[in-house]
């Protein structure tokens, strides 16, 4: 059957990348189709039941600032909230939400089903319709043809997915779901650069069989933080503890004894696993000097006894899993509800993409999520939103948009993937962002919501809330600039009495806030401020980090000069005099779009960038005089 409706955007896959892609395109007014093999799994958390964390919450806040769904779903489904790095600087603070899987998934599905311009259809996609070098649509498992101006692929771990438990293996996209075999074969036919990666998950445990009394409880923060700029604590369901226990030497001996049947250590698995989320067998092998490793027992939800033992991801045979679990303190009688497993899947070298996440080889075809070599819900959601908005803009022949490295962690993510590529699952960290003081999770809305409004991603309700917040920040900052404390006036005396600090000369309330040991809550008490905690936080960070932020703005200005120098798509690096063969090859492989991108390619020296710039300028001068 040839479906009668022509879509602007078709999104294949209903995971974290797919849902954000479909929602973004639909919010922008494009006729959008979301194809999923199973409507019941829309927004499913396939691995750990958590959103956010170091570097990751910055992405979640950016998705949220652009009108995305992930942060609000985390607020509606979060059963524990914590601020990580709370004693460190604002740039590296991160919010983490332990999520109830069912509530999170329900929140995502509710958002999808109530989104205008979005159709959902339950069918696996088996084929792409490609005419010449342009995608024209999709063919499903039943042979239904859907036509579209653009297609976004967000296939997660489903492309050629193989599940491993010990030396046994089976086809699967995740436990209980079939893989995408036909689509994987079709993509390989298109001559896109393909590789194999792997990820894993731990065995799930029945909480009724665990002795929590010998473990360390890990409560959430109080007052509880929120994930979304539109979130409120009243959205949160009941809050619960996680628990911490440890592996021991007996656990490690059991694991070592099972390595001869490990698919990782017998060469059965060829795909590379995530460096920063290693399996327990990998930890024992790589960190043999450690006599224990932490295990975090995380509730999967309020209405289930299922626990996620974060820290013991494994693909060892089930009998070894059984022994290693029961060797851990408090889990001596643990009942395993689901075995752990590893999954191996196809991904495509992201260097074959444009910065918009459109493939260079096929016009109108976009990739987002694990298909690009990333790991994590947050990384997937960020790519999905970018791919969806750019597919939407291309469908209406509008100029596409991608944030720069100094604008967003999304920009860092995309630039890293396309400039550097990846041979292992890529995870975001704050350390990857050179301008992280400007890219804090607290100011994601200031960086992106205005842009999101211009792109059509931000609705009236969010826009009004953002404008109200920024007006409050401006009003309160101005008020504090005009309130003065002097050694002998009432405000000055109250300040000294409250804080025990010295006050030798007249200072504005803003100047007092610049002091290292003074926080906004003290200034609020001193001056009778009634603004929200969120507004106060913005003012405090802006005041305390003003000098550092100004310095980063200067660095960005220098970078922009390189960003503004575009490298023509057909630029011939072979004619650049003085370039080494190695650097020439690297530049030809990556095909950087700007001098700034060229400067970030490993091994490309500042001198080489200078040579390319000189050649571009010479070429431009030649064209002008011709």
UniProtKB/Swiss-Prot annotation:
Residues involved in FAD binding: 13-18
Top-rank taxon, per record: Bacteria
Disulfide bond positions: none
Pfam families: GIDA, GIDA_C_1st, SAM_GIDA_C
Cofactor or coenzyme needed: FAD
Gene Ontology CC annotations of this record: cytosol
GO molecular function, one term: flavin adenine dinucleotide binding
Localization of this protein: Cytoplasm
Record's keyword terms, sorted: Cytoplasm, FAD, Flavoprotein, NAD, tRNA processing
Primary residence: cytoplasm
Keyword Protein biosynthesis on entry: no
Protein family according to the UniProt entry: Belongs to the MnmG family.
Function of the protein: NAD-binding protein involved in the addition of a carboxymethylaminomethyl (cmnm) group at the wobble position (U34) of certain tRNAs, forming tRNA-cmnm(5)s(2)U34.
PANTHER family per record: GLUCOSE INHIBITED DIVISION PROTEIN A, PROTEIN MTO1 HOMOLOG, MITOCHONDRIAL
Subunit record text: Homodimer. Heterotetramer of two MnmE and two MnmG subunits.
Protein name: tRNA uridine 5-carboxymethylaminomethyl modification enzyme MnmG
Species this chain originates from: Acinetobacter baumannii (strain ATCC 17978 / DSM 105126 / CIP 53.77 / LMG 1025 / NCDC KC755 / 5377)
Lineage of the species this protein comes from: Bacteria, Pseudomonadati, Pseudomonadota, Gammaproteobacteria, Moraxellales
